[in-house]
Amino acid sequence: MQKNFLSLALLGALALPALTAAAGPFSLDEAIRHTLNQNPELRAAGHQAQAADARADAAKGAFLPQIDVRYLARRSDNPLDAFADKLNTRSVTGADFDPARLNSPDTSTLHATQLSVELPLYTGGRRMAGVREAGAYAEAARLGYERHQQAAAYNALHAYRAAQAAAEAVIIANDAVEAAREHAETAARLVRQGRIVASDRMTAELNLAAAEGAREQAANRQRLAIEALRLVTGMPADAELVLPPWGAPDAVAALASAAESEQRALATRKDLKASEAFVRASRAKVTTARAAFQPQIGVIAADSWYDSNAALDNKSQSIMGVVSMNIFSGGRDWHGLTAAHHDTEQNELRLEGLQQAVRGEVRAATSRLTEASARRAIARQTADKARENVRLVKQRYGEGRTILIDLLMAERLLVEARNEELAAGLGQELSAAQLQLAEGSLSLPGDVPTR
């Protein structure tokens, strides 16, 4: 069933059509699904997992009898071959023992067909170790594929939210341009009325130009963010993407302690489990290497047919037991066993190093999320205060109790506060996803094929 599911996932990758704006807004789940189906590295990991499954099935075949058929056609005037052909075809006569005929036989033609069945009975544990090794490699490949899925899903989420935030930044920039244009028009009118000096009008015009320049920068960042989203999801370069508007993320719930998150990661991270599977595979390889020092016992049964033509005639049967043991192989077996031990130690140390790295990732992700949550709370309060400040300064400016530069400064602070609130919200959402990825708990869309 696992292989069937993975096959469906790979077939879906080839069949999934490119999404267009005609299908409606491009949702986050759609972006993740498209990434999982179109990402070349992920598809390669899926094929790697299928190949490992096939090798695991092949290893199990070592416990089944091996059946072979062999056909041979030969012409020879070799004395031994010629006499053996007569024996095998049961055509020996008394005249065939004449020394002259034995030493100088006529050319003999033989057609031989053999059907044999071979079954190893004891291999020193090599067959079972081979099954364990191949099974562990298959498990490691499957877990590696699932970890690739989570990493690809995070990359899609990152690109998607960044594109949404870039679109929201354009809205903020448009609002800033509209406010700056309003102030520039007001300043121009007041100059004509002689109520303010010309330098105030120029200040308002410079403020408008700065706002328009910032809007161009925001629009370019949005284009780059959409292009990055197309690249991550595997969308065509000319695909038109329509995203739903940015929605501020909810406040972060109470975080678990770093120790709890570390334990969760050590228990659930797919790459850690894959590394553990590599350790099991290398230990099985040690058992396989040790089998070279054990006797090999097997049984072979065969039916053979011999004739001067291709017909199946003159059948003979044989059955034999075989016991073999290598005495000297030039040190190959000893060196192979030593290498297997070193491979095991290497994989155990890599597992230990990965465990330490995972702990560090979880601690760093927890710290980033704590910082991002606090930063967003501050940014939200600051944005609210900046809006109220603009309202009050506008009121005072309309009453003639403050100067234009104060109003422009208040508007600029509001733009900065809104951009900071947006950046803090994006940082909080990405930090939360990074923590889930570090813990190995990042969820995928429900209909994504998994093994």
Where in this protein do the model-derived segments appear?
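Gram-negative bacterial Sec-dependent N-terminal signal peptides
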Residues: 2-21
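Bacterial Sec-pathway N-terminal export signals of envelope proteins
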Residues: 21-72, 78-80, 120-121, 237, ...
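DHp/HisKA histidine-phosphotransfer helix
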Residues: 24, 41, 130, 200, ...
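Small/polar-residue-enriched beta-strand and adjacent coil segments characteristic
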Residues: 25-27, 66-147, 257, 264, ...
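Periplasmic alpha-helical coiled-coil/stalk elements that build and connect Gram-negative outer-membrane
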Residues: 26, 147-264, 365-372, 414-415
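Charged, alpha-helical scaffolding/interaction elements associated with membrane systems
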Residues: 37-39, 154, 193, 268, ...
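Amphipathic alpha-helical coiled-coil segments
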Residues: 44-59, 148, 152-173, 182-184, ...
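Short, glycine-/polar-rich solvent-exposed loops and beta-turns at beta-strand/coil boundaries
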Residues: 61-64, 152, 197, 293
